[in-house]
Amino acid sequence: MKIGIYGQFYHANAAQYIGQLLELLDQRNIEVLIEEDFLKLIHSNNKIEKDYKHFSAFEELDNSFDLFFCIGGDGTILKSINYIRNLDIPIVGINTGRLGFLATIQKEQIESTLEELLEKKFSLSPRSVLTMQTNPRSYDPVFSHIALNEIAVSRKNTTSMITVDTWLDDQYLTSYWADGLIISTPTGSTGYSLSCGGPVITPDADSLVITPIAPHNLNARPLVIKDHTTIKLKVSGRGKEHLVSMDSRIATLQNDTEIIIKKAPYTINFVELQGDSFLNTLRKKLLWGEDKRN
C-alpha cells in the first residue's frame, strides 16, 4: 500500500497526532511519501528522524497511491487537490483546525479509524471541480490550478461596486452590480456562497450556483445552473483591475478580460466512512435545521 501525506502548517496541538499517524503507518510497513515542505516542518518540530520519501508537485505523483491524507483544516484540503487532479487518489481529511467541514475524521480518531481506512471499508464521494481560462491569456500560475469550492471575482482597491457581465453558453444572462460574483460547486455551496445567501447543494447534484456578493439590486438572487454550462464573465468598474480567486488562491486581472469558467472533465474523490454522510455533517457541523423541538 502507498500513501501520500500533505499539510501546510505545523501546530503544536497536532504534533502528537502526526507522530501517531506516521508510527501506525510504519508499523504496517506502508510506503509513505510526504509533501516536501511539510516534511521539513515535521523534522524541525518533531522528534521524527526517519527520512521519508517526498514529493513537491503533481507531476511527481501517479495513480499508484491508495490514499492521500490531508492534515489541517479545510484550507489545506482545498490546496491539496492540485496535487491530485485527475489521478483518482481518494482524499482523507484529518482535521487539526477548527470546523473542518470537508474533513473525513478528527485528529483524535486517527487510531480508531485507520484500520477501516487501510482496509478500504469506505465509499467515495466524487466532487466536481472548476477550471478557468482568460482572454487575453494570463500567465499567472493561479490559473493553472483547479477550484474545489468556488471561483470568485471581486473589486480591488476601491469601495465602489463593479459590474460583472455574465454569459451562459454564450447567451447573455445579466450584468451584476455588486462587490463581486461567486461561481460555486456543490461542495463550495456551504462556503463563501452560503455566506452570501446562496443555497446548500448536495455534493452529488450536477449543478453550479452563481451567487452575487452584496448586489445593489433587489432582483439579483443566486441562480442554480447545470454544471456543464460554460460561464463567461467580463468585469468593468471605476478601477482598472479586479481580483479573481480560485478557492484560496488570488490573482489580479485587468478589467474587460474575458474569464471562461468550466467544470473539469474529472472529479476529486473524498473518502466517506461507513455511517457518515453529507447530511450528517450538515447537521453536526453547520447545525442545519437546529430546533429545540426536534
UniProtKB/Swiss-Prot annotation:
Enzyme class (EC, first level): transferase
A GO molecular-function descriptor: ATP binding
GO cellular component, one term: cytoplasm
Signal peptide positions (record): none
Cofactor (UniProt): a divalent metal cation
Keyword NADP: yes
Catalytic activity: NAD(+) + ATP = ADP + NADP(+) + H(+)
Function of the molecule: Involved in the regulation of the intracellular balance of NAD and NADP, and is a key enzyme in the biosynthesis of NADP. Catalyzes specifically the phosphorylation on 2'-hydroxyl of the adenosine moiety of NAD to yield NADP.
Protein name: NAD kinase
Biological process per Gene Ontology, one example term: NADP biosynthetic process
The protein's Enzyme Commission number: 2.7.1.23
